[in-house]
A protein has these predicted regions:
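Entry beta-strands of beta-propeller and related beta-repeat scaffolds
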Residues: 129-134, 190-192, 203-205, 238-241, ...
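Hydrophobic, helix-forming membrane-interacting segments
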Residues: 6-42
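Beta-propeller blade signature
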Residues: 156-163, 255-258, 304-308, 377-379, ...
C-alpha cells in the first residue's frame, strides 16, 4: 500500500470512529432530556423534595449522595414510626454519689463568641440523645439587646435546645417553640413541647407535638399563666404537666393537665395539702411520676405532687423532713411539716428538685440560706414521710462563693440497665441583679448523674470573669 493509500485509510477510519462517538453523545443527551421531561416532573425544583421520594429519585438519579441521604431519612422515619410509647417500668438506681454529666461554659465562651442569652435551662432526653434546653432572650451576651434581659417575660423569648455540653449559639440552637415559660418531654415516639407567651393578664400556652402545634390553653386566672421550666415525663403516651395561674405571693390556681400526642385528655385542679405550686421538677419510675415544686407564697419546705399517669389522678403534700430546701429559708428546724408550709421564705423562692425514694432519697439545695449561691446534694432517708429525718451524707456541687440558681431533675429513660439513673442540673446565673456592672442576665449549666460508687467531689462553678465583659 503506497503512502497516499495509507493516509486515506487512516482518515476514513478516524471519520467513522468520530461519527460513532457523535451519535453516542446525541443518544445520551436525548435520554437525559427524556428522563427530565417525563410527565409530572417538577423541573423547576433542583433540590430533592423529602415529601415525594419517587420524584426525588427521578430528579437526582445521577447523584449518589442525595440518594443516600433520602434513604437514611426514610429509614429514620420508619424507625420512629415503629417506636413504642415509653413505659416507666424501672425503679431508681442506688445513689451513692454524683458524677459530672455535662457543662456548657456558656458565659465564659460568650465573652468572645455569639452565645445566646438564656435563663431557666434544663436537660431532656429522647431515644437518640439528651440535649440542653433553655429560654433564650433573642440576643447574644455581647449584643446591645442584652441590656434588660433581667426581665423574665418578653416577645423575644423562645424555648431552644442545643447539643449537650455545647454553649447555645445562633448556629447550633434549634427553636422548639416561642414563649417565656416552657416544658418539654419525649413519649418514646415524638417530643411534646409547651410554650407560654402573651401579656401577664392574657397569656396562653401552645402545645407542640412532633414539631407541629396541636392544642392551645388560655389563661384561667389572668395572672401569669406559667408551667414547669424543666422536663415533663410520659408513661404509655400520657404526659402530665403542672400549670399555675394566679398570685405568686398568695393563693393561686394550679392544674394538672394530661396530654397524649399533644392533645388534652383531661385536667384536674390541685388536690392534697400543698398550698402553693410553681416550677415543678418531675421524674418517673415504677409507673408513677413525682414532682418537687416551689411554694413561693409561704413554704421554705418544698411541696410534692405525686401523679398516677394511668388513672390520671394526683395528690400533694410537703416534704416532711426538717431539711429545708427552698431559698431564701430559715435555719433547719428540729421537726418538719408534712401538710403545711414551713414559714420563712418571705414571698420568694427558687426552682428546685429532689429524688424521693425511701432510704435512697436525695435532696438538692443552695448552700446559702439567703441568696442563690452554692449548691449541695444531701442524702436524707425517708425525707418525704419522716418529719425528723436528717442528712447522713452529702456532696458539694458548687461552692458557696460561686453563684447558682434554678435546679431540676431529668433522666435518660432509654439508657440500658435495669434501673433509672437519677440526674439533675444546676443553673449558674451570672450578670444582674448580683453583678450589676454588666447590663445582661444569663447563665451556664452544669449537670450531674448518680453513681453507685462513692466518688470524690469538686467545685463546678460558672467560671466566667465579669471584668472581661467590661
Amino acid at each position: 500500500m503506497n503512502p497516499n493509500q495509507k493516509i486515506l485509510c487512516t482518515s476514513a477510519t478516524a471519520i467513522v470512529i468520530g461519527t460513532i462517538a457523535v451519535l453516542i453523545g446525541v443518544a445520551n443527551l436525548g435520554l437525559n432530556i427524556g428522563l427530565h421531561l417525563k410527565p409530572n416532573c417538577n423541573c423547576s425544583h433542583s433540590q430533592p423534595e423529602a415529601t415525594n421520594t419517587s420524584q426525588t429519585i427521578i430528579n437526582n438519579y445521577y447523584n449518589e449522595t442525595n440518594i443516600t441521604q433520602i434513604s437514611n431519612t426514610n429509614i429514620q422515619m420508619e424507625e420512629r414510626a415503629s417506636r413504642d410509647f415509653n413505659n416507666l417500668t424501672k425503679g431508681l438506681c442506688t445513689i451513692n454519689s454524683w458524677h459530672i454529666y455535662g457543662k456548657d461554659n456558656a458565659v465564659r465562651i460568650g465573652e468572645n463568641s455569639d452565645v445566646l442569652v438564656t435563663r431557666e435551662p434544663y436537660v431532656s432526653c429522647d431515644p437518640d440523645e439528651c440535649r440542653f434546653y433553655a429560654l433564650s432572650q433573642g440576643t447574644t451576651i455581647r449584643g446591645k439587646h442584652s441590656n434588660g434581659t433581667i426581665h423574665d417575660r418578653s416577645q423575644y423569648r423562645a424555648l431552644i435546645s442545643w447539643p449537650l455540653s455545647s454553649p447555645p449559639t445562633v448556629y447550633n440552637s434549634r427553636v422548639e417553640c416561642i414563649g417565656w415559660s416552657s416544658t418539654s418531654c419525649h413519649d418514646g415516639k415524638s417530643r411534646m413541647s409547651i410554650c407560654i407567651s402573651g401579656p401577664n393578664n392574657n397569656a396562653s400556652a401552645v402545645v407542640w407535638y412532633n414539631r407541629r402545634p396541636v392544642a392551645e390553653i388560655n389563661t384561667w386566672a389572668r395572672n401569669i399563666l406559667r408551667t414547669q421550666e424543666s422536663e415533663c415525663v410520659c408513661h404509655n403516651g400520657v404526659c402530665p404537666v403542672v400549670f399555675t395561674d394566679g398570685s405568686a405571693t398568695g393563693p393561686a390556681d394550679t392544674r394538672v393537665y394530661y396530654f397524649k400526642e399533644g392533645k388534652i385528655l383531661k385536667w384536674e385542679s390541685l388536690t392534697g395539702t400543698a398550698k402553693h405550686i410553681e416550677e415543678c421538677s418531675c421524674y418517673g419510675e415504677r409507673t408513677g411520676i413525682t414532682c418537687t415544686c416551689r411554694d413561693n407564697w409561704q413554704g421554705s419546705n418544698r411541696p410534692v405532687i405525686q401523679i398516677d399517669p394511668v388513672a390520671m389522678t394526683h395528690t400533694s403534700q410537703y416534704i416532711c423532713s426538717p431539711v429545708l430546701t427552698d431559698n431564701p429559708r430559715p435555719n433547719d428546724p428540729n421537726v418538719g411539716k408534712c401538710n403545711d408550709p414551713y414559714p420563712g421564705n418571705n414571698n420568694n423562692g427558687v426552682k428546685g428538685f429532689s429524688y424521693l425514694d425511701g432510704v435512697n432519697t436525695w435532696l438538692g439545695r443552695t448552700i446559702s440560706t439567703v441568696s442563690r449561691s452554692g449548691y449541695e446534694m444531701l442524702k436524707v432517708p425517708n425525707a418525704l414521710t419522716d418529719d425528723r429525718s436528717k442528712p447522713i451524707q452529702g456532696q458539694t456541687i458548687v461552692l458557696n462563693t460561686d453563684w447558682s440558681g434554678y435546679s431540676g431533675s431529668f433522666m435518660d429513660y432509654w439508657a440500658e440497665g435495669d434501673c433509672y439513673r437519677a440526674c439533675f442540673y444546676v443553673e449558674l446565673i451570672r450578670g444582674r441583679p448580683k453583678e450589676d456592672k454588666v447590663w445582661w442576665t444569663s447563665n451556664s449549666i452544669v449537670s450531674m448523674c448518680s453513681s453507685t460508687e462513692f466518688l470524690g467531689q469538686w467545685n463546678w462553678p460558672d467560671g466566667a470573669k465579669i471584668e472581661y465583659f467590661l
